[in-house]
Swiss-Prot record:
Metabolic or biological pathway: Glycan biosynthesis; sucrose biosynthesis; sucrose from D-fructose 6-phosphate and UDP-alpha-D-glucose: step 2/2
Reaction catalysis annotation: sucrose 6(F)-phosphate + H2O = sucrose + phosphate
Designated name of the protein: Sucrose-phosphatase 2
Pfam families for this protein: S6PP, S6PP_C
PTM entry text: The N-terminus is blocked.
Annotated source species: Oryza sativa subsp. japonica
EC number in record: 3.1.3.24
Reported function: Catalyzes the final step of sucrose synthesis. Inactive with fructose 6-phosphate as substrate.
Coiled-coil intervals: none
Broad enzyme group: hydrolase
Gene Ontology molecular functions: magnesium ion binding; sucrose-phosphate phosphatase activity
Family (UniProt): Belongs to the sucrose phosphatase family.
Amino acid sequence: MDKLNGSARLMIVSDLDHTMVDHHDEENLSLLRFGALWESVYCQDSLLVFSTGRSPTLYMELRKEKPMLTPDITIMSVGTEITYGEEMVPDDGWVEYLNNKWDRNIVVEETANVSELKLQVESEQRPHKVSFYVDKKSAQEVIKSLSEKLEKRGLDVKIIYSGGQDLDVLPQGAGKGQALAYLLKKLSSCGKPPNNTLACGDSGNDAELFSIPGVHGVMVSNAQEELLQWYSENAKDNPKIIHATERCAAGIIQAIGHFKLGPNVSPRDVDFPYVKENPVKPTDAVVKFYVLYEKWRRAEVPKSDSVTQYFKNITHANGVIIHPAGLECSLHASIDALGSCYGDKQGKKYRAWVDRLVVSQCGSEGWLVRFNLWELEGDVWSCCLTSLALNAKPETPEGFVVTHIHKTWLKGYSSADEQSSKL
């Protein structure tokens, strides 16, 4: 949250499984489309929040499986844990708030003899969440009985049923909705209330997100039965909540456009040749640079001199690239080498994307852009911490020129091929 000096232009609060992440999309195209849009347009002045039922353990597993961005804020374990930044620093104030009228030991004791409840794996049992599986047929009866038992023991709890099988027992003050309300209150108290907030979900445990006053909401097209039922009973006349016609992250992009919250055309949906941006937008320039790089290697653009010439036009004739082991090469020589790599990743489930993009102004017409450059081929991941120097050149057809690229491997994500990423 500290990255912004003022209010976020847009705060997106999204569930992960079957909302931001489409597990039926093997190419992860909608997720990559959203990532390119966010890094290109929103990353510098907006906040990305992931709100998931997953525990930290399962959340980190998902990050190793899918090409996800690094969020500014992560809400996990059905709204019982709030953390900040890549380091995932916990919110101690939220922990203290949840301790009111909560005793995990009593919950475990009272549920031990309920035969219909089956404990989920140990990683899903958290300080303020006890999680079970329960058959859909007996769910409502179990919820009613368990609520009465825990109330008699002096606890104030919330029981959430979602996905047709998951039952979570939480403190009454917990949940995705309360966590979002807490964040909005915290941002407002710092004088930084978001200009707009978009909540995104697909299942019953996301309904609370749409109940927060002033929040826009999108149920993705593949939303589950329990969320659609909640919508028909509680929100069908609310113009701030829509049921998208697109699945998962594509539905989120659709909602940004529907509510007029900002641009919603992903750089991955923009055809080459690119239209000159005036003034230059460094984030957009970098994202498009690597989208085109990926498309060249996947043979998704024509094998044309116009593509390699574009790369040369936007790089300085004397510019250099320093590869992770320290090898220094001419940018133009690297582009010549790229020419021979056309289609070398065709049919190989290869993707390249940028994450954690940060821009620093250098003089009146220069920028230093830092980001993580990820490349994925099959199930092999590599990542370079990348710095790119870029200057405005309004007199040129593209409007800017890259003078320097410096790359180092992210620990644990190096490649045996030192120049595997070429640029």
